[in-house]
Structure formats: C-alpha cells, structure tokens
Amino acid sequence: MSSASSKRSVMTLFSNKDDIYCHQVKIVLAEKGVLYENAEVDLQALPEDLMELNPYGTVPTLVDRDLVLFNSRIIMEYLDERFPHPPLMQVYPVSRAKDRLLMLRIEQDWYPTLAKAENGTEKEKTSALKQLKEELLGIAPIFQQMPYFMNEEFGLVDCYVAPLLWKLKHLGVEFTGTGSKAIKAYMERVFTRDSFLQSVGEAAPKNLMDDK
C-alpha cells in the first residue's frame, strides 16, 4: 500500500480537464452519484503523489482507499460493478462483449483522429475533422435507431461517444446534410443529461453518495 493512497479517505480522481479519457470517467462518477475529490493535474508538471501512485504518471488515475486504478476502461468497469445502480453495462455476456468491441473500435479508430485534430498542423486538423465528420454522418442511421448509441439506455459506450462529439463541437464541427438530424438529436440528449452537465462543470452534483 502506497503512503499516497493511505492518506486519502475520499475517493480521488487525478484528472485533466482537457483529457477525453478523464471526461469518460467523470460522466460515470456523475451517473453513479459518487462523492469524490477531483485532483486537477498539470500534465507538464506531474505531482509527486500521482507518480507514487501510478508508475506511468497518466490520467485518469482513481484512488479508492487502498486501491489505485489507471486506464479509463478499467476505472469505469470497476465503478459500474462497485456502484451497480444505474447499470451502465448490459446484462447478457454477448451484449457486454459487443459493447466492449464498440468501445475498442471508438478508441482505436476515432480517438487517434481526434488527437490529430487537436494537436496536428492546420492541414492535419482540417483533414482529421473532415474525416471524423464524414465517418459519423456515414453511421447516422445508428443514432436514429435507438435513444442512445446502439442501446435503449445510456451506457459506457455513450461515455466514449459523447466526449468525442463534445470535443468536435468545440472544435467548430457542425453536422449538416443527410444524417445530421439524428446526430444532433443524440447530442442534445446526452449533452443535457445531468451527469454530462456535471462532467463539464455546468451543473452541480445531485443525490451524491459517498463511497463507503
């Protein structure tokens, strides 16, 4: 047990406000109504206690008593099991496996393109945003079939998709033409959820419970 973790009596999330993986975890914490301390991290000057807790020095890092977790997927699945209501993973193993595959594809296919849009040259940014916009419009029927991403209920897959769309919105992407109505309706649904508003600091937490 590290001394850094033993000092913390409240669940703590080391995060950075601009990091998409941290945003995922914040949505889950808000969905679950968990009381936690957010420790904002300057990625250019990592705090010593984070380095002591996480050998990779990455965010998000979650500290829950003696347990230290890093990697957003591991953190989110832990939170979903630790705080079962509301459930964010589907009941049946086949459905869960399909959701995990979707999350993997989003992380591998879309997130690197988003990183180019955020950190690349102007040419790379323009190309990346165009690619993401076209790919999302290309799957627009998926957004139309169900209230949430391939699901009747809000779940972990939405915690991958919603932060991506939020980033695109703030990068100036506007969805127009065929398929845009379904995507914009989805964005409206997820962006107005209490959990999402809390995750971006635009609403106060509600019905919080501590982690004991």
Swiss-Prot record:
Residues 92-212 form the GST C-terminal domain. InterPro entries: Glutathione-S-Trfase_C-like, Glutathione-S-Trfase_C_sf, Glutathione_S-Trfase, Glutathione_S-Trfase_N, GST_C, GST_Omega/HSP26, SspA_C, SspA_N. It comes from the Bacteria. SUPFAM superfamilies: GST C-terminal domain-like, Thioredoxin-like. Pfam families: GST_C, GST_N. Residues 9-87 form the GST N-terminal domain. One of its GO terms (cellular component) is cytoplasm. PANTHER family: GLUTATHIONE S-TRANSFERASE OMEGA (PTHR43968:SF6), PTHR43968. Belongs to the GST superfamily. HSP26 family. Forms an equimolar complex with the RNA polymerase holoenzyme (RNAP) but not with the core enzyme. NCBIfam families: PRK09481.1 (NF007016). This is Stringent starvation protein A homolog. The gene is sspA.
